[in-house]
Curated annotation (Swiss-Prot):
Protein name: Cytochrome c oxidase subunit 3
Gene: MT-CO3
Membrane topology: Multi-pass membrane protein
Native source species: Phoca vitulina (Harbor seal)
Regions crossing the membrane: 16-34, 41-66, 73-105, 129-152, 156-183, 191-223, 233-256
Topological domain spans for side Mitochondrial intermembrane: 35-40, 106-128, 184-190, 257-261
Length: 261
């Protein structure tokens, strides 16, 4: 590094992309084993490998950005483009679920009884837990914006308070969603309605868990004084992701819970 004459970060060889790919293989194979053979061993191994990979990869990136100073403005610009493209790819990912839902609901087949929701399906009341979930996520969007502005103003105390509130609301949302799943009168195997409902809301719930994990990492990093008022892309990326999760939920609520019921 002593002879480097450019601002780009030449990343050292790392095993984490390989272990990350291995964990993805183990988790997907583990899900198949769980669904078809009621065995969770492979899934647990995949989740453990994934957790260890995340911890160690994050640790390396934190070292590179803070202590080693590799995240120059031009490197941060590349990271910004990367995060934007990642969120765009997620938009298309969810677009597929919405397409499946509207394709099935706007022209219900005779097998569904020619109506939507299909005959025999009792949909959830959109004015109960789903509405509470909506208000919880909207409130978390406000609190993370408060955290971002506090960080830019150098107000450490308010930033930590706001970030803690956001994480708490994210965990509360996940618990509400879990309780809702427990009480639903239909399952993922109840035709196209059950499939689209649980796939769309379930993947959104997974994204809330991922976003909450991002924010918890940011909270720990803020406690360790890793962020400054003008150098905090790790938090900014997590905030962008959280706002994306917010917006997706609004579309889910209006489409699947309210209109679809």
């Amino acid at each position: 590094m002593t002879h480097q004459t450019h601002a780009y970060h030449m990343v050292n060889p790392s095993p984490w992309p390989l272990t990350g790919a291995l964990s993805a293989l183990l988790m997907t194979s583990g899900l198949i084993m769980w669904f078809h053979f009621n065995s969770m061993y492979l899934l647990m191994l995949g989740l453990t490998t994934n957790t260890l990979t995340m911890y160690q990869w994050w640790r390396d990136i934190v070292r590179e950005s803070t202590f080693q100073g590799h995240h120059t403005p031009i490197v941060q610009k590349g990271l910004r483009y990367g995060m934007i493209l990642f969120i765009v790819s997620e938009v298309f990912f969810f677009a597929g679920f919405f397409w499946a839902f509207y394709h099935s609901s706007l022209a219900p087949t005779p097998e569904l009884g020619g109506c939507w929701p299909p005959t025999g399906i009792t949909p959830l009341n959109p004015m109960e837990v789903p509405l509470l979930n909506t208000s919880v996520l909207l409130a978390s969007g406000v609190s993370i914006t408060w955290a971002h502005h506090s960080l830019m103003e150098g107000n450490r105390k308010h930033m930590l308070q706001a970030l803690f509130i956001t994480i708490s609301l994210g965990i509360y949302f996940t618990l509400l969603q879990a309780s809702e799943y427990y009480e639903t009168p239909f399952t993922i195997s109840d035709g196209i309605y059950g499939s689209t409902f649980f796939m769309a809301t379930g993947f959104h719930g997974l994204h809330v868990i991922i976003g909450s994990t991002f924010l918890i990492v940011c909270f720990v990093r803020q406690l360790k004084f890793h962020f400054t008022s003008n150098h905090h892309f790790g938090f900014e990326a997590a905030a962008w992701y959280w706002h994306f999760v917010d917006v997706v939920w609004l579309f889910l609520y209006v489409s699947i819970y309210w209109w679809g019921s």
